[in-house]
Structure formats: structure tokens, C-alpha cells
Swiss-Prot record:
The gene is trmY. Its EC number is 2.1.1.257. Signal peptide: none annotated. This is tRNA (pseudouridine(54)-N(1))-methyltransferase. It comes from Halorubrum lacusprofundi (strain ATCC 49239 / DSM 5036 / JCM 8891 / ACAM 34). Specifically catalyzes the N1-methylation of pseudouridine at position 54 (Psi54) in tRNAs. InterPro entries: Alpha/beta_knot_MTases (IPR029028), TrmY (IPR007158), tRNA_m1G_MTases_N (IPR029026). It comes from the Archaea. One of its GO terms (biological process) is tRNA methylation. Keywords: Cytoplasm, Methyltransferase, S-adenosyl-L-methionine, Transferase, tRNA processing.
Amino acid sequence: MRQFVVIGHDVPTDPDAISLSDIPGAGRLDLLCRCVAAGVFLSHGIRERVRVHLVVADEFTVTFDADSLRHLHPDERNVAARIRDALDAQDDAIGHMPADVSPGVELRRMGLEATLDRVLDTPGTSSASADPTLVQLHEDGDPLVDAAPPTDPVFVLSDHNDFAPAERDLLADRAERRVRVGPELLHADHTVSVVHNWLDTDGYESY
């Protein structure tokens, strides 16, 4: 399984503060929507065995599970509406029990650290790997092309902001690798696409 944990620092937790007419104005929610689309969609379908976790204001995590998604479209407005619905269900997220928003979409009352604990404590889905591998995507990391693709990776990346000091400390302690996808800085959603391509083409010699 491939998993992406995207940190949204400025997205409001109040669903009433999210306007579908001004998605970027909701703490650059548009960027998180594009990360979801890049994470779960193919040209004419949905990927298998992919999850995207959006950490909102280090308070809630909205999870999109590609294997269970229904009636989700790749446009920003559709994804933003699903995120807003998730935040609207926050009263149903009690403790670490999720609120079921729609097929394939859940909201948990968890920040980054608790989300990483939960994701990393879930055994990998490949017989070749017992545990997921946490990989931080960062401009100061090692070149992606020099790294061997992990079997059950969990990639952590930030939105348009850099990682906060506490996030950097947490990832320095928990991440097994820190990699950079290329020589130029990319938007978070483009980074997700590059990582997918890296994993998709591993072992391919011809197309």
C-alpha cells in the first residue's frame, strides 16, 4: 500500500469557514484537494491500495481510501466539498474512533503524531514488508533517484508552508528516510505525482 500524509497548516477546522466559491481562501485548501486527486486518481479510474491522509491544523485527519471511494471526482470543488463534509462530522469523531463521512472518507480527531502512530502501527499490505516505511519528502533530502523504493511507504509532506519545528523534530525521530523528488521545488500535489511515477516505473525497462 502507498500512503501520503499531507499537513495542512492553515485550513480552518470550522466547515462554515470553507467556501466552495473561494477554496484557496480556506488556508490553501485547493492545494490539499489537488493532493487528494493526485494521490487517488488515474486518467480513467481510481488507484488501488492508496490512502491519502490530510492533517488539518494538527487537530483532525481526513482520510481518503482509494479502495472504498465512491462518487468522488478529481475536481477541486468536489474534493473540497467532501473535506468540508468531513469537518462537519467532527462531533461524531469521538476519541480515536472515526466519523464515517461517505464511502472511503473518514474523519479522526487526530493530529500529526497520532496519525503517524496509527498508520505506522498498521502492518504493511505486502508479504515482503511487515511494517510501513516512513519517508519524509523535503527539499533538503537525498535524491529520490538514488533511493530504493520501499514496499509499503508512508510519505509525509507539507502544504505551501515548511514543516513547523515540532513537525521537523517528530519526523527526524520517526522517518527512516528523507528524500527530495528533484532539483526544482514543486507544489505538493506535483510531488505526489512524481512519487507515484517513481513507484509505478520501478523495474520497468520498456513501455
